[in-house]
Amino acid sequence: MGLLDRLSGLLGLKKKEVHVLCLGLDNSGKTTIINKLKPSNAQSQDIVPTIGFSIQKFKSSSLSFTVFDMSGQGRYRNLWEHYYKEGQAIIFVIDSSDKLRMVVAKEELRTLLNHPDIKHRRIPILFFANKMDLRDALTSVKVSQLLCLEDIKDKPWHICASDAIKGEGLQEGVDWLQDQIQSVKT
């Protein structure tokens, strides 16, 4: 640890590190969203599907995020629960143009919310209704209705329409998540 790191820590200037789980079905845009939140010089040019999980980092104005980008492929979703205890917040990404798999996304969300490591914690959940740029995309209101988000009463949650490739809607979501993390004890 360098002198500046120590000094900033002593002065309370060092950013608080937060562990965030990034979940959602495969091809929903999880990795693209996390990549877009990193500084432009740290972004990957080629995004490939995540196998298992990867750890990514990005910073907001007051927090340092360590994101566990979890594979959304069916055979890897059982790995999600091994990281629930570590998570201080959740980003759940939905492909708003994939109407056929909205039921699967809803089932995975219910499984997540009912898991013992999540169920009794007031953990903030940010939903990105991604791929809003596509012609057949559902609105974030419709996605919210299909996933029955209004039934989530014991956790703060927010849904943002997003276009991960252009970066639209991402900052709004991160700002909300940052506010929640700073005000909610998980």
Swiss-Prot record:
A GO MF label: BBSome binding
Q: Can you cite an annotated GO cellular component?
A: axoneme
- What is the protein's major site of localization? membrane
Q: Which family does it belong to?
A: Belongs to the small GTPase superfamily. Arf family.
Output the superkingdom of the source species.
Eukaryota
Residues covalently joined to lipid (N-myristoyl glycine):
2
Q: Where does GTP bind?
A: 24-31, 69-73, 130-133
Q: How does it sit in the membrane?
A: Peripheral membrane protein
What's one Pfam family here?
Answer: Arf
Q: What is the protein named?
A: ADP-ribosylation factor-like protein 6
Complex formation: Interacts with SEC61B, ARL6IP1, ARL6IP2, ARL6IP3, ARL6IP4 ARL6IP5 and ARL6IP6. Interacts (GTP-bound form) with the BBSome a complex that contains BBS1, BBS2, BBS4, BBS5, BBS7, BBS8/TTC8, BBS9 and BBIP10. Interacts (GTP-free form) with IFT27.
Write down the InterPro entries for this protein, in alphabetical order: Arl6, P-loop_NTPase, Small_GTP-bd, Small_GTPase_ARF, Small_GTPase_ARF/SAR
Give the UniProt subcellular location, in the record's own words.
Answer: Cell projection, Cilium membrane; Cytoplasm, Cytoskeleton, Cilium axoneme; Cytoplasm, Cytoskeleton, Cilium basal body
Q: What does this protein do?
A: Involved in membrane protein trafficking at the base of the ciliary organelle. Mediates recruitment onto plasma membrane of the BBSome complex which would constitute a coat complex required for sorting of specific membrane proteins to the primary cilia. Together with the BBSome complex and LTZL1, controls SMO ciliary trafficking and contributes to the sonic hedgehog (SHH) pathway regulation. May regulate cilia assembly and disassembly and subsequent ciliary signaling events such as the Wnt signaling cascade. Isoform 2 may be required for proper retinal function and organization.
For this UniProt record, give its keywords in alphabetical order, as a comma-separated list: Cell membrane, Cell projection, Cilium biogenesis/degradation, Cytoplasm, Cytoskeleton, GTP-binding, Lipoprotein, Membrane, Myristate, Nucleotide-binding, Protein transport, Transport
Its source organism is Bos taurus
The GO annotation for biological process reads: brain development; cilium assembly; fat cell differentiation; intracellular protein transport; protein localization to cilium; protein localization to non-motile cilium; protein polymerization; protein targeting to membrane
What are the disulfide bonds? none
